[in-house]
């Protein structure tokens, strides 16, 4: 059966001398793998539409296993991302997170829209750290491991200062700080943003200015939480961390 669907290229894997296996996140059919025959050839009509992060419409011959990609049409190439090594690192991490955090052939229009809006923002120059934070926070709910971000996990307090307890899965208020000696400190701004990221509609995001220290606090919480509960090992995470370290070094050189 032939199906036509909007999709985003999550990853490609070389298969034989000339073919590629392309993993797509589609709006209508969820995550699916397709064989793109001849896509490794530069003159192939499938080569251009099997580029990482590309958003397009795809005509697929479906089957019980791998489908076959018959043809496709690009809607947005996300070329700016692919031409920037730093943006590529961020986008690769986001797509691998969605790839590893979702099951095949289970439609989820919300996830599709989340990835599409995230890639668009990256492509248009929105702060990459903020985009990534939003995706990571929202993916916690998708994977069934959302922390408590609305109130203290112990007493239900909704106002005041909060830190984050990895052990207890969420915010703890200052009255309960003693219950977790290993809590991670959060400024009021970092706590507010973590809560906001869970509910925020990415399509409404404009330019955001967040202090480096606040970003560092949020990054620490998300890294520890994912390490503790997700069970995921993402190769792209290491690459992204290397790019972040390089960016800091380059920034330091510019300031000196």
Swiss-Prot record:
GO terms for cellular component: bacterial nucleoid. The keyword Calcium does not apply. This is DNA repair protein RecO. One of its GO terms (biological process) is double-strand break repair. Disulfide bonds: none annotated. The gene is recO. It comes from the Bacteria. SUPFAM superfamilies: ArfGap/RecO-like zinc finger, Nucleic acid-binding proteins. The keyword Membrane does not apply. Belongs to the RecO family. It holds the Pfam family RecO_C. Involved in DNA repair and RecF pathway recombination. Keywords: DNA damage, DNA recombination, DNA repair.
């Amino acid at each position: 059966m032939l199906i036509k669907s909007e999709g985003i290229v999550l990853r490609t894997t070389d298969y034989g001398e000339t073919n590629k296996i392309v993993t797509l996140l589609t709006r209508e059919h969820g995550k699916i793998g397709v064989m793109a025959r001849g896509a490794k050839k530069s003159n192939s009509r499938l080569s251009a539409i099997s580029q990482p992060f590309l958003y397009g419409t795809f005509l697929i011959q479906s089957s019980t296993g791998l489908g076959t990609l018959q043809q496709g049409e690009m809607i947005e190439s996300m070329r700016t991302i692919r031409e920037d090594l730093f943006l590529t690192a961020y986008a690769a991490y986001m797509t691998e997170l969605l790839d590893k955090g979702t099951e095949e052939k289970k439609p989820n229009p919300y996830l599709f829209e989340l990835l599409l809006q995230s890639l668009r923002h990256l492509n248009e120059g929105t702060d990459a750290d903020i985009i990534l934070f939003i995706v990571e926070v929202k993916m916690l709910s998708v994977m069934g491991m959302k922390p408590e971000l609305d109130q203290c996990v112990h007493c239900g307090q909704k106002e005041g200062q909060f830190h984050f307890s990895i052990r207890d899965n969420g915010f703890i208020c200052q009255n309960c700080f003693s219950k977790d000696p290993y809590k991670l400190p959060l400024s009021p701004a970092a706590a507010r943003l973590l809560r906001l990221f869970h509910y925020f509609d990415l399509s409404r995001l404009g330019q955001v200015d967040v202090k480096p220290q606040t970003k560092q606090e949020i990054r620490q919480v998300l890294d520890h939480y994912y390490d503790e509960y997700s069970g995921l090992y993402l190769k792209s995470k290491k690459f992204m961390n290397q790019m972040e370290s390089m960016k800091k070094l380059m920034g330091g050189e510019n300031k000196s």
